[in-house]
Curated annotation (Swiss-Prot):
Residues 1-318 are annotated as: Ribokinase. It catalyses: D-glycero-beta-D-manno-heptose 7-phosphate + ATP = D-glycero-beta-D-manno-heptose 1,7-bisphosphate + ADP + H(+); D-glycero-beta-D-manno-heptose 1-phosphate + ATP + H(+) = ADP-D-glycero-beta-D-manno-heptose + diphosphate. Keywords: ATP-binding, Carbohydrate metabolism, Kinase, Multifunctional enzyme, Nucleotide-binding, Nucleotidyltransferase, Transferase. The active site is at D264. It comes from Serratia proteamaculans (strain 568). GO terms for molecular function: ATP binding; heptose 7-phosphate kinase activity; heptose-1-phosphate adenylyltransferase activity; phosphotransferase activity, alcohol group as acceptor. This is Bifunctional protein HldE.
Amino acid sequence: MKVTLPDFRRAGVLVVGDVMLDRYWYGPTSRISPEAPVPVVKVETIEERPGGAANVAMNIASLGANSRLVGLTGIDDAARALSAKLNEVNVRCDFVSVPTHPTITKLRVLSRNQQLIRLDFEEGFSNVDPQPLLERIQQALPQIGALVLSDYAKGALSQVQSMIQLARAAKVPVLIDPKGSDFERYRGATLLTPNLSEFEAVVGHCKDEAELVERGMKLVADFELSALLVTRSEHGMTLLQPGIAPLHLPTLAQEVFDVTGAGDTVIGVLAAALAAGNTLEESCFLANAAAGVVVGKLGTSTVSPIELENAVRGRAETGFGVMTEAQLKTAVAQARQRGEKVVMTNGIFDILHAGHVSYLANARKLGDRLIVAVNSDASTKRLKGETRPVNALENRMIVLGALEAVDWVVPFEEDTPQRLIADILPDLLVKGGDYKPEDIAGSTEVWANGGDVKVLNFEDGLSTTNIIKAIKDGRG
C-alpha cells in the first residue's frame, strides 16, 4: 500500500476519556531504612508526564493536528501540572474540575532502572455527573473530523453510549480504545482498537488467523461496529470491516524496546489521519508505521511527522543520504516548506568513531534535519597530508549516510565549506571542538541570513589521529 502523509494541520480531533498524570521519582539507593526493611531512595530527579487519554491527545498534537482534550480532574497540583504539560505541546485542555475527587495520579519510584513501588492516587469518577462532558462533546463536534474515546475504566466514559450517539448523529467517526470485556457498551462505534489480549478476553482464544478473522467479523456484526482493528504486537494489525476482505498489516518495527503507550499512538495517529482526509485503510497503515517507531523508544512517547514519513516511505524514498549540491538545495527547500529546522555541520570524518557518532547525534537534536558536508579526498590531503584520507570520500559518505542522525551528506572540494554554506544557508551551523563561533567558516553568512551558530564539544580522548597512531603502534 502506497500512502501519502496528509496535511495534519487541517485535522481536528477531540479526545475524551480518563486523563491521568504519571509521576516518576528517580534516585540512587545504597542503604536500608532503620525504620523498616525497605530501601532508602535519595530522590534526585522528578519527571511528570501526561498519561491515559492525555497521552493520546499528545500523540495527535505531535503530528501538528489540532488536538483537544476533555476529561475529569480534581482541583489540585496534579491537575495544574497536567494542564501545563499539555499546553506546552499544543493540546487544548477543556477539563471538568471535580472538587470532591483528586486528579488520577500514578507515582513510580525508581532506582538503577528498577521500579521499586507504584503509588496510585485515585478514587474514580464513576459517580460524577456526565452532563458537562456531553455538553463539551456537543460543542466540539462541528469543528472536528474524529472523536476518540480513551477508556481506562476510571469513570469518564460512564455514559459512553450517549457519546457514541452524539458523534454518529453528527456524522463524525468515533474511535474507541476499549477497556474490559463488556464490548456491548461500545455498540455502534465506528472503530474499536483492542489489542490481542483484550480481543480474546471477549471472543476467546484464537488458534490461528482464520479463527481470529471469523470471531472478529462476528463481533463486528454483534455490536454493529463499522470496523475493528486488532493490534497484535509482533504480528502487526488486522483490520476487519463488513463485506470487505480482512486487511493484515505486518509490523514495521525494527527493534522493540518498550511497548508502553503504543496503543495510544495507534489510535491517535489513526484518528488524526482520518480527520485529515485519509481512508480508514490508509489511516491504519499510518498507525501501524507509527507503532513501529514508538516501540523503538524507551517509555511513553510520541511520533513526529518526520519520523512517520521516514517509517512509511523509507530513507531512500524521502530524499536522504548522499546528494549533489543541486539535489541538496531541492531537499532543503522542501524541508523549509514543511517548517523544518535545518542544521549543518562539516568535517573529514575519515575513520568514524564513537566521538563522531555522539557529536552528530547531538547536532541532530538541535533541529529537524542534519546536513553533513564532507571534505573531498584532495581537500583532505591538503589539510592532513599525503597519507590521508585513510578512507576514500565515497566510503566516508556511505558510512555517514547510514547513521540515523544524518539526513543528507554532500561533498565539497575547497579547504573550507564556506561557499557551500553560503549557498545552503542553514538555520543552524554547528561545529565541534574549541572554535569561537566567529572563526567558523560560513558563520558570517549564516548570521546575516538570521541563522545561528553553535559550538559543540567532542568527547575527550577520541580522535582519528589517535586511532591511526594506535594502529601503527600495534595497539589497534
